[in-house]
Each structure stands twice: as structure tokens, then as C-alpha cells.
Amino acid sequence: MDSMPPPELALVISHEARCKAVALYCDAIVRMHWGERLINKIFGRVMQSHAAGRLVVQHYRWKVEGAERPTLALLQRNAGRGTRTLASFVAVLRLTGMVAAEADPHDRRVRYLVPQERLIDGLRAWIAHHLRCCEALGLLDAGHEARLTDDVAFFDAFVCRAGSILDRVVSHRGRFGGWSWFDERDGGGRVAMLLLRDHFKANPKAHSPSLAFPLRAHELADGLGLSHSHVRGMLKEAIEAGHLAHDAGRAQVRLTPRFLDETMSWLLHFLSWFAEVAHAARRAC
């Protein structure tokens, strides 16, 4: 499958401003997971994060639009595959208090899945980081991030429409080269985001070739709740695949130009989908 070229977005601002915005965005997302062993275990894979997202979206669509309430059967029907894994994941969400089960008053066999405050607050913070970066890159006017926090109707409208983001992630799977390579691995998306953050911190201005930065595999593994051997293996394979260039003598790496282009293409597409949903939510309320 051919890689996706970057959208014609966010290219009018300076290189330095773009570097700063992306570094701050990556840092904010990484900080949400840094040292949070339980969160990383629960949401370590894309399927798990998306299943939780689908659950919350369906709950808000029921609350706002009168759509069908989320149940395990509904999530499994929409997932199409991996239904046993999905059932185990929902059980973990219930066990950790992120989701509660509510019996249907007319049919006690039916259990509705109700996202709890911890899960909703985490989603709100996660969306806010994306809208902040959209504003910094010029994809959205200022004020959307603040409105997400302060305006309940806007948050509800955004979440109701956020399923389109998940749909696009699925339809674009495998289209972003090196980013897709990382994202398919356990914790790989967060590892790639941390590498992107450190790249832009080391390269606030354009350099050719780009400057290398320290490779702290043990610290990275500990912070993201991954095994040292898993992270070492992932980074070794990434170097062999041409996503990273390694200076073993100085224990440093740099992103290859191809990997940087592919990852920035993914990020700009991803953020543009958030911007579209934000525009639609604003029009709705």
C-alpha cells in the first residue's frame, strides 16, 4: 500500500514554530502515560485504545442523539474480529473502575457499558492536547481547546462525532510507513512519539543531516511500563528497517529523513481529522 503524502496543511507557519508545536504535543501525550504502568498495560495496543474510544462515542451518541446504548455485544458486532480479546479488555475496564455495567430494567440479561469519570476525564485531556496542537499549527482558530474544557455541549458534540476519527485511522492503517511500523507494536506508538519529541528538541531549527540525540532505552522502557528486552528489540529492528540511524559509539540515534516525513505525514493527517470534528461540533452547538 502506498504511503500517504502530507496534507497541504500547517505548512505556512515557520519550521521553528512547527517544531515547537509538535515537540510540546508529543511531550504532553507521553506525559499522560509516563510512569502510569496500569494505563500503559490497559491501553498499550491500538485495538484497546480504539475499543475504549468506540465505547465512549457510542455512550455519548446514545445520550445526545438517542442512538443504541453501548453493550459488549454491540462493540463485538462492530469490531468484526477479535471478539474474545475485546471481551477480556472490557472486563479489565470494568475491573479497574473505568467502565461500569448497568442492567436493562426490562431485560436483566442486557448489560449496558457506562464509561466512568476517570475514563471520560482522560479522554477529555487527550483530545485537548490534540486541539492545542491544531491551534498552534494553524488548523484551528484559538479557543477550541478552552471550549472543550469549559463548554459541556461542545465536548458532547465533539465526542458524538469522534467516531469518524477512529474510522479514518482504520481506513488509513498501514499508509504511513515508519509510523505504521511502530504503531503496530506493543507500546510502539508512544515510543515513536517520544523519539519524535526528542528529535525536535534536538533540532529546533532545520539541520541537514538532522542532529542525533541520546538513546535512553532503559529509561524509556521504565517510563512506559515496557520490558527492557521489548524496547531494545523494537529499536534494533527500527534501525535495521531504516527508520532510525544509530551512533553506537555515542549511544545516540537520529530519525532518518524518510521516517521523519512519514511520521509528520501521519501527524498532520491525524490532527486534520480532529480539526474537522471540532468544526462540525462547533456548528452543531
Label for each model-derived stretch:
Residues A125-H172:
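Compact structured core domains
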Residues P7-Y25, R147-S164:
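An acidic intrinsically disordered interaction segment
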Residues M1-S3, H15-P105, V110-H129, G163-C285:
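Long compositionally biased, domain-poor regions of proteins
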